[in-house]
């Protein structure tokens, strides 16, 4: 985790790698900031088992699961995948202990189409971004209209649709369900319901502009970054961290509030009209 980042919740840092606690990848910092934004009054554990390249040892995962058990956590976020398919009895015992104690485990599917060993356990909640022609599984929760703008190292932001960064979105839904007294046994069923699938699977539509004055103001301010073409369509190739961070500054300036991580997804960015209308909706 990048400890220069402000958090609203208490965090305990534990490191099971051969590297320092410093996050040089960005992955861990992003996940923690997304989970931290869910609510105040939470107690977070940042257990580092992946190195700067995003790789880790199975032995580190086992020790981390044991640490989570001993720390009496409620939810374990595993934004990682295991591509080996030889059954590991020690890992299975640890996972079973966690699940039997009522700990909710959330993981993500592979970004390259490979099967995640963890998601083969039907008691573990797995999430994946919905894409065209994707072969779906009844054991996976799909979220449409990814990517979205998410926090990164330092005070920067990126546009990403990686599955890892969808787990906090599901954990937020789990938190809300638990607050509404939904039982752990019924959590997955509720999450699978269409009402919890983010947005629709329809083609993104260009909206009609609502506030022409706001449109003109924003268009002038963002023209320097070349994020939209002459038809006001979003240019994904220009979505560099620098440009996305600048876009967040515009959002914060216009709305007079800190950027909310669940607020700007691809449908809100696809056309300049959509972007302006989304800012306008926050202003109202």
Predicted features by range, described:
Residues 1-16:
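Acidic-leg catalytic submotif of subtilisin-like serine proteases
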Residues 5, 108, 114-179:
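Extracellular S/T/G-rich loop segment that most often corresponds to the catalytic His/Ser-adjacent loop
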Residues 30-33, 168-175, 246:
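Short amphipathic alpha-helical face segments that pack within enzyme cores
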Residues 56-77, 88-103, 113-128, 132-142:
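Mature extracellular/periplasmic domains of secretome proteins
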Residues 192-284:
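Phosphopantetheine-dependent thiolation modules in NRPS/PKS and related acyl-activating systems
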Residues 178-190:
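Short, charged, surface-exposed loops that flank catalytic or proteolytic processing sites
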Residues 45, 104-106:
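Structural detector of well-ordered beta-strand residues that form the stable sheet scaffold
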Residues 18-83:
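Subtilisin-like peptidase catalytic core
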